[in-house]
Amino acid sequence: MPHWAAVIMAAGKGTRMKSKLPKVMHTLAGKPMLQHVLDCVRSVEIPRSMVVLGHGREQIEATLDDRTEVVVQEEQCGTGHAIMQAIPHCHEVDHIIVLSGDQPLIRPETLRNLIRIHIEHNAAATLLTACFENPHGLGRILKEGDQFLRVVEEKDATPEERLVQEINTGTYCFNVAKLREALKNITPKNAQGEYYLTDVFAVFHAQGEVIRTYCTEDVHEALGINSRAQLAAAEDVARQRILSYWMEEGVTIIDPRSTFIEAGVVLQPDVVLQPFTILKGRTQVAEDAVIGPHTTLTDCTVGAGSEVSHTVGNQAVIGGHCTIGPYAYLRPGTVLQDKVKVGDFVEIKNSQIGEGSKIPHLSYVGDSQVGKSVNIGAGTITCNYDGVNKYKTIIRDKAFLGSNTNLVAPVEIGEGSVTGAGSTISKNVPANTLAIERSTQKHIENWVRNKKK
């Protein structure tokens, strides 16, 4: 969309959140509220995005990418004042769309409709509105018939005006040239002593300019988030949207009430999500995989046909047709090739496990390279840390480690080798070798343990 720009209001302090974090940085479905709005703008191909910052500027600015321009509002003197700071940056821009950084539930299709109406009617301004049964605290849209008159804020409205149910969402399209002139005519003469952006509509009306409205059917898009309770309510709406989307895309979700999927997750058709599954970050799950129950995956990749149950995974890669869990813990740097089995009470960290290898139960594998078709017996651990440095363990293809083997890194187990149960291996084992390390078993006859009387 040439000659368009978006201006996102994000300068407010968010006092009711009672947080050191700026309001628009609180997350919804795994992303900051502000990022939801930015992503929505970019999905409708608006080429420029400007964010007006004030409180918490440094924290917010540090999270923005190079595509986002920052406009600073040093003093928060109202929405009109915020736009006054942005207008000088609108070089070669014919129209702007103004949004609020604390309204993360706005949808791309709504913005497209708003922009379409604005262009079709060659309007000076087009407002996004919504109808609430209880619009308490929200600015009202005043009309004469279908003709827009003005917006009145709750604190400045008469008792009769407060009965109006159509409200101002705070999202607008403006003709930049006309907005620039109208801003010269607004003053802070209101109950708050601020420059209201909404006062430009009265200026437009007096000048006979075209003002249009578009009423969204989804009132959730108008929800501004000012408290933790409102954030929780918005989280529920976002979660239901995400769940509905993936079910429409061919994903089976056994119990939507107990399933949580963040916005950055990608799922393929015929994935099955069991109850109490939580998928976070950039997690990707391929077709026919079954996740859960009671599984949390963050920034993980799961291959086709794998089964992952009662597992916590973070920044792990799981190949195709693997079996993981129950009660496995996959830490960052874990890479499992196809057909790997990781069983109960197994922890893996920063390790590569080759195709067809098995770690069935009660093991810790850290900083290791494990080959193909390896069997790691119950209770086997890699001793990879000396209190200062981490060391690597290498286990070659087809090795068989007996139960309760301790591998003192750095150490290498050769291809096809076997370790005896209970061995502590601290030296490299050649290929096709049996390695046993045990102290001599002693029997003390006629020994009876002293008992306290």
Curated annotation (Swiss-Prot):
Its cofactor is Mg(2+). Mg(2+) binds at residues 102, 226. Disulfide bonds: none annotated. Residues 1-228 are annotated as: Pyrophosphorylase. Binds 1 Mg(2+) ion per subunit. Residues 229-249 are annotated as: Linker. The keyword Transferase applies. Transmembrane segments: none annotated. It catalyses: alpha-D-glucosamine 1-phosphate + acetyl-CoA = N-acetyl-alpha-D-glucosamine 1-phosphate + CoA + H(+); N-acetyl-alpha-D-glucosamine 1-phosphate + UTP + H(+) = UDP-N-acetyl-alpha-D-glucosamine + diphosphate. Acetyl-CoA binds at residues 378, 384-385, 403, 421, 438. It comes from the Bacteria. It is found in: Cytoplasm. UDP-N-acetyl-alpha-D-glucosamine binds at residues 23, 73, 78-79, 100-102, 139, 153, 168, 226, 331, 349, 364, 375. Pathway: Nucleotide-sugar biosynthesis; UDP-N-acetyl-alpha-D-glucosamine biosynthesis; N-acetyl-alpha-D-glucosamine 1-phosphate from alpha-D-glucosamine 6-phosphate (route II): step 2/2; Nucleotide-sugar biosynthesis; UDP-N-acetyl-alpha-D-glucosamine biosynthesis; UDP-N-acetyl-alpha-D-glucosamine from N-acetyl-alpha-D-glucosamine 1-phosphate: step 1/1; Bacterial outer membrane biogenesis; LPS lipid A biosynthesis. Homotrimer. In the N-terminal section; belongs to the N-acetylglucosamine-1-phosphate uridyltransferase family. This is Bifunctional protein GlmU. The lineage of its organism: Bacteria, Bacillati, Bacillota, Clostridia, Eubacteriales. The gene is glmU.
